[in-house]
Structure formats: structure tokens, C-alpha cells
Amino acid sequence: MLRVDQTGTILIKNGTVVNDDRYFKSDVLVENGIIKEISKNIEPKEGIKVVDATDKLLLPGGIDTHTHFQLPFMGTVSVDDFDIGTQAAVAGGTTFIIDFVIPTRGQSLLEAYDQWKKWADEKVNCDYSLHVAITWWSEQVSREMEILVKERGVNSFKCFMAYKNSFMVTDQEMYHIFKRCKELGAIAQVHAENGDMVFEGQKKMLEMGITGPEGHELSRPEALEAEATNRAIVIADSVCTPVYIVHVQSIGAADVICKHRKEGVRVYGEPIAAGLGVDGSHMWNHDWRHAAAFVMGPPIRPDPRTKGVLMDYLARGDLDCVGTDNCTFCADQKAMGKDDFTKIPNGVNGVEDRMSIVWENGVNTGKLTWCQFVRATSSEAARIFNIYPRKGRIDVGCDGDIVIWDPNQSKTISKDTHHHAVDFNIFEGIKVTGIAVTTIVAGNIVWSDNKLSCVKGSGRFVPRPPFGPVFDGIEQRDKVRNELLRKVDRKPYEDDNTKNSSK
């Protein structure tokens, strides 16, 4: 891998700047990693790096809200570590990722956080942040959540409603976690599947002799995702706190989110590249390896309408920002479940191809405008997780994370050319038109001419303050609701014996 001089200074000439609210032709000057000037005809200073972006778009660096790099999971570890994973990210135009700290049940949140941060700090090639999963509940967890928010830069906590006997929390635990999130100004996130019913469905499939990858989707149908999504939103609304549903994979779950949003509930939905780019019919492929490669949770749905409908929701703003749930396992790891689909490590790729998949299926189909694309792949995530406009916008004072995007250049996605460590790509053979030709992180070119020039460990941890825009109006809303909750003044109840004895 090439090493570059990290000056953080670059001048981009003749491009079209695209933010989520407007686009315009301009030059962009980045100095010391920060955008210094945006105007036409900027004269380059002596010795400065100049890049010509004629006929190209200048986009805010992509933000992937959902990755799992080097995750210990289901008896193995995902093969895209923080080095390889962030190389793949920048090769596709993503310059910021938010990974998940996932403590084991009973483990200290702070201990797990410190481990994840150490792994990341040593390897990341772009800036990053960390969500933290809550896999159990106690007074210790409550105290450690406060420390994470106030001292460690965390403003989001995830609950699993699935993975029974592992990560799954009960509804009562989730209620208390949501209350604590509200107190701390952190957004509650939810993996929404009915874990008890999934557990029973898995037993049923195995009893019927369905042991292959198709059993994965059959045991956790769309209805279980939709039901859990509704339940999570109802619980969050009872607490009056914002909730963010991760990896929305089904029409049913998206419908539920849309319904509650129309009723004024503060809920956010995250579709992922897999669900927007392919369908789950691959799990019925006769090649076991091929079928197993598509196993993730919630499943990619086999209904071929799903990816189009999810894109429609994204275009309307009923779903918010696109993540990937990038969690990759090679063939020998997936083969742990060759005789039992419940043992197939769940996870697929996506961090490298996310932006091109959204462009191909959104912009190129006429469903998304350029500005809506930026909203879906960058700016809305920055707002929700309270790092806007530092991230998610091209403007003076913002971080110099910029993608030079060629809307007319094509490529065919393949495991043979991708930058992941995994030996399979779920988007294999898909031709996309619209790709990142140059990726700039903090003013430094890290991807250009189909070559990476990253510096391992050069990325920075970005703390995310609490009480972001998702909490706007929450206090007043809660106050108004509570004013409607009044007791009825009435005389003490007296039965006939009491009445007679008082005479």
C-alpha cells in the first residue's frame, strides 16, 4: 500500500458541489484537513495539490451508520477488520463509519468500549465513532451509560430484540434502557425481530428437516420483523424518546415506521445496501456456499418488490439514511452451519458498494435527486447522530472529507476486484453507473485511479455530543402529554357495611 504525505491541503477545481439542499459549480480549497474556501476561480498557491473535477460531482464523504468490523460473533470473527474495512469504505466513497461495541451479557460496557476503541484506533483509515449495544440491564449498566455519554463521546445505544440467550433483551429491560437514553440525550437503536418467535421458528424448521440457508428466512419471516418494529416504537413512544430502527429489511417494517411517523412519533429508519441492492431469493440457490453468503439478520427478503419499495420510502423521507450492517465471513466460517442454518454466521458485505448501489437504484431510476442521494448517504446520518455540519456537508469550516463522483463512469462489482477481506460479494456481477473516482479524507487523497493510498491508523475518533436535533421538542411534547394525565378526585369508596357502621 502507498503512503502519502498527509498535509491535509488540496484544491479541487471545476466541480459541482452537491449538498442535501442545493448544488452549484465551484472550486473547493481544503487546508489542514478543513474546508477553507468555496468559490469559483480559486488561484492555487505554490506547491499545493490541485485536482481537476470537470464534469464530476463533489459530494460530502459518505457516512455508513452501521458496520461490524472484526466482530466476535457466533464462534468466529468477521474478516473485515478496521484496517481492511475502512480501506473498502474509502474505495467506495465512504469517509466515516460508526461501528458497534457489543458487550457480552454481564460484561462491563466500559471494558467493551475500551477494547473496541483500541482495535479501531490502531487501524482505521478514516474517521469513525462507536455505538454501544446494551445486552443486559442493571444499575451498573445505567451508570456506565452515563459515563459513555458524558466522558466517551457516545450518543447512541442499541437493543437487540433477537438472538435469544445471547444479545436479546426483554421488553421490560428495553423500557428501562429507553428511559435512560432519554435522560442522557442518547438515541435508542433497535434490532427489531421477535426473538422468541424466531427461536421457535428455528426449532420448527430443523424438526422439519430444513437445515439449509433457506431455513434462515423461513424461521424469521417478515411479519416477525414488522411486529417487533411496531413494539419497539410503541415502547419508545410511551417513554417519549426518539428511536432508530436499524437495518429495515421488509416492506412490513417500513410500513410500520411510516404509519407511526404520520402520527408524529419520533422514529427513524435505516435501510441497508443489501436490502436496496439484491433480494433474498439467493438463499434458495442450489449452491450451498452461494446461498449461505446471503444469510444475515433480519434476512434479505425474497420478495423481489422489496428493494424498490424500500427505495421509494427512502425517496419520500419515510426512511432516513442508508447503512450496510457490513459483517463479513468467508466460506469456511459460513460452513460452520453446513448442517444447521442456525450456526451460519450472520452477515454480508456492503461498505464499499453502498454508495454506488444507492446511486444505481435511486438516482439512475429517477427516484432520488442528487441532493436526496447526499441526504440518504451522508447528511441525514450526520444530523441524527449529531455531527452535522462537521460531517455530511461541503461548507467552509467543515471537515475536508470529499468524494469526487463520476455519475457517468461504470463498473461491474466483483469479489475479484473489491477491497474486502471476504471471498464473496453479494452484489457480484451487478453493473453500476456512478462511482467514487477520488476519495479525500481530511484533505488527503486516499483513493484515486483505482488505487488506495491510506495510512493505517490515521483516522480519528469523533465524539458525538448528546441531545442532538432528534431531541428537539421532546421535552415540551413530554410536558404536554403529562399534563393530560390527571387523577380523578373522588370520595373514598364505602361498601354497604361501612355505610351502616357509620350511622
UniProtKB/Swiss-Prot annotation:
GO biological process, one term: pyrimidine nucleobase catabolic process
Cofactor: how and how many bound: Binds 2 Zn(2+) ions per subunit.
Xref: InterPro entries: Amidohydro-rel, Hydantoinase/dihydroPyrase, Metal-dep_hydrolase_composite, Metal_Hydrolase, Metallo-dep_Hydrolases_sf
Cofactor names: Zn(2+)
The EC number(s) this enzyme carries: 3.5.2.2
Top enzyme category: hydrolase
A single MF term (Gene Ontology): zinc ion binding
Residues involved in substrate binding: 163, 346
Superkingdom classification of source: Eukaryota
Record GO cellular component, one term: cytosol
Pfam families reported for this sequence: Amidohydro_1
Catalytic activity: 5,6-dihydrouracil + H2O = 3-(carbamoylamino)propanoate + H(+)
NCBIfam families for this protein: D-hydantoinase (TIGR02033)
Role: Catalyzes the second step of the reductive pyrimidine degradation, the reversible hydrolytic ring opening of dihydropyrimidines. Can catalyze the ring opening of 5,6-dihydrouracil to N-carbamyl-alanine and of 5,6-dihydrothymine to N-carbamyl-amino isobutyrate.
Protein name per the record: Dihydropyrimidinase
Originating organism: Dictyostelium discoideum (Social amoeba)
